[in-house]
């Protein structure tokens, strides 16, 4: 049996966040008596909760100028002090249940080097869960499945991996987008297969607001820290569609859709680059015609989009027709000797 060290970076324990974070931590404790739990950071209430629930505490962690924790500092310290070989980084609002434990046991018994990750299920939880109720897990799972809000493959909230896998981590900050997709990319880049456990594990995300950020949801997803995270991963980005295996019905199966999904992403990227390249090339013509790039999603923006598409598409068709006509006659343009 592979025992687990779970580590997380809680927000301040206050209000609704206090309730859902305690729910999450107590659910991890119910996975197995020997599970080790580490909370990282000195945010309000963290030390007191660690003492109350009997979990380990890493108080000091590197932060940026806004006080947001660096992912690298969290990962390096957690891997250094973890008692067990298998670690799990999970967001501190995620309730894990027995299906998660079974998934970890299955994969860790078959693979020495791996990353298990999965999509979350969004659920409204506004009160403390009753862990003394023997049916708490069945009730919560039923609520999640009935709500039926499983996130897309871009949203990953737990990562299970052997100690030492992440020996190099860029200067991402936690709580902003981008770093989770980099973790997937890095695992594949060092030869560790990814197991998508989304079909086998109901990982319950307890919904919350974004009042912890001064600019709310917009600041979390599009603020300066988010933009820095995006720049850090550049093209080093994967989703669960790139998983090597999927876990389903207690069995690991090769992800047959992996190459198709990757090809689709490359195609979309190519279309975007082609579109914006043609916009640059045709800018003088479009300006002469009084057309501008659209930044609005309203009626005017949509009209400009179709006008631009007509001009760009027409020019692209003319270019393709010229290339086809030249090469179909066996001619080579002047100055292009072969």
What do these predicted ranges mean?
Residues 34-44:
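Short beta-strand/loop segment that forms part of the nucleotide-sugar
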Residues 84-97:
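Short beta-strand-to-loop acidic/aromatic patch adjacent to the donor-nucleotide binding site
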Residues 173-316:
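C-terminal catalytic/acceptor-binding lobe
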